């Protein structure tokens, strides 16, 4: 069901109105407390600027870290407010707590176009319990609700789901709208051939996605540490590579399901091996049928890269989730980098390339190719759940278009 978006509200609807905007400002900090990557803050700017331009009073709600329902001084949103002020070119006032007298006073003093950032909503235990009393107090600070936090949309919390019961309209922000358009679109109405590239170390964390994608895709390419569970299930020796023994039957079932559906399921034909898990480990390339004892696979091999590139060449939509190897180690980053480069190339020829959150995003950014992708998702768990076909509570709660 399509959701109503911020684009449907004009200045007449918003001028002078207090708009509660749930944003995803869960950014990484270094030991000195400085923000090391402000991507998520910048991703919310189109929505914030639109509201400011329409004369709304913008009240931002966000979580940061996992303070477990109590105040944690290291998890205050102070550095976020400072960075947001720089990006907007205007003062962003931060409250001492997300509800209560200070928040009420600062929101009450707002002029049209002002921006207030409420303190970390997870300092209140009731946030993650989706407590309706807390949701009502948050909602009392506003007249309209906008959810632009796709990365938190798979959680039914007070600030993502509960507040919608008290605020109308409740609409999707521009970032949320773009995420749904690309990810939902890729699953529901893709241009074909549709391929999914699934990587990462564990089959267990990607089971739901693999099952759902085998149902929907024409091709599924698998890389990362999880390939060794598939090889072992085929009866191959995998040395000391990572294997999930309790998922061997599942690996067989997934291969059988793909075959029965006529889906091309590709596993690497060769791998880059290491004698230990380290950036400077000794390495060698081996066919997957000839992995020696005492060695572990840390990347897909050069032959596998060529096979994967050939499989992707004619695709019109590609979803990528999870690296091909341990790309944090330069020696074992070739497979992941090759996929990033290939997606940039086919994207230039009209293929829709979607990077589905998590480590793939870091890989594409490390390769300097982020700008060449059609869409880079800001959600990790949320993207996976959407691709699995699950209903996201934070999306379901919004007004229908």
Swiss-Prot record:
It comes from Synechococcus sp. (strain CC9902). Monomer. HAMAP family: Phosphoglyc_kinase. Its EC number is 2.7.2.3. Pathway: Carbohydrate degradation; glycolysis; pyruvate from D-glyceraldehyde 3-phosphate: step 2/5. This is Phosphoglycerate kinase. GO terms for cellular component: cytosol. SUPFAM superfamilies: Phosphoglycerate kinase (SSF53748). Pfam families: PGK. Substrate binds at residues 24-26, 40, 63-66, 122, 155. ATP binds at residues 206, 297, 328, 357-360. The gene is pgk.
């Amino acid at each position: 069901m399509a959701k109503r978006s911020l684009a449907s509200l004009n200045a007449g609807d918003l001028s002078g109105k207090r708009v509660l905007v749930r944003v995803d400002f869960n950014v990484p900090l270094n030991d000195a407390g400085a923000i090391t990557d402000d991507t998520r803050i910048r991703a919310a700017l189109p929505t914030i600027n639109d509201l400011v331009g329409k004369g709304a009073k913008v009240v931002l709600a966000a979580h940061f870290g996992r303070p477990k329902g109590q105040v944690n001084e290291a998890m205050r949103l102070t550095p976020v407010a400072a960075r947001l002020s720089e990006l907007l070119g205007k003062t962003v006032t931060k409250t001492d707590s997300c509800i209560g007298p200070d928040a009420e006073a600062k929101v009450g003093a707002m002029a049209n176009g002002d921006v207030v950032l409420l303190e970390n909503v997870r300092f209140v235990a009731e946030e993650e319990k989706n407590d309706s009393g807390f949701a009502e107090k948050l909602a009392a600070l506003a007249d309209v609700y906008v959810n632009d936090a796709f990365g938190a949309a798979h959680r039914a919390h007070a600030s993502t789901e509960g507040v919608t019961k008290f605020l109308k309209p409740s609409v999707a922000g521009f970032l949320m709208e773009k995420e749904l358009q690309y990810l939902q679109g890729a699953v529901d109405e893709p241009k074909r051939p549709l391929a999914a590239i699934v990587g990462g170390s564990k089959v267990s964390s990607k089971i739901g996605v693999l099952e759902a994608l085998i149902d929907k895709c024409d091709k599924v390419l698998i890389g990362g540490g999880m390939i060794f569970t598939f090889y072992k299930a085929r009866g191959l020796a995998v040395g000391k590579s990572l294997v999930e023994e309790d998922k061997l039957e599942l690996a067989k079932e997934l291969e059988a399901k793909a075959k029965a559906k006529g889906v091309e399921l590709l596993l690497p034909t060769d791998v880059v091996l290491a004698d230990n898990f380290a950036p400077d480990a000794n390495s060698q390339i081996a066919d997957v049928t000839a992995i020696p004892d005492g060695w572990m696979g840390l990347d897909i091999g050069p032959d596998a890269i060529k096979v994967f590139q050939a499989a992707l060449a004619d695709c019109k939509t590609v979803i990528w989730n999870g690296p091909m190897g341990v790309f944090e180690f330069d020696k074992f980053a070739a497979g992941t980098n090759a996929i990033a480069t290939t997606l940039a190339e086919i994207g230039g020829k009209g293929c829709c390339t979607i990077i589905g959150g998590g480590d793939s995003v870091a890989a594409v950014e490390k390769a300097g190719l982020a700008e060449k992708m059609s869409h880079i998702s800001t959600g990790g768990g949320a993207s996976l759940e959407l691709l699995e076909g699950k209903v996201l509570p934070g999306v379901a709660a919004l007004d229908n278009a």
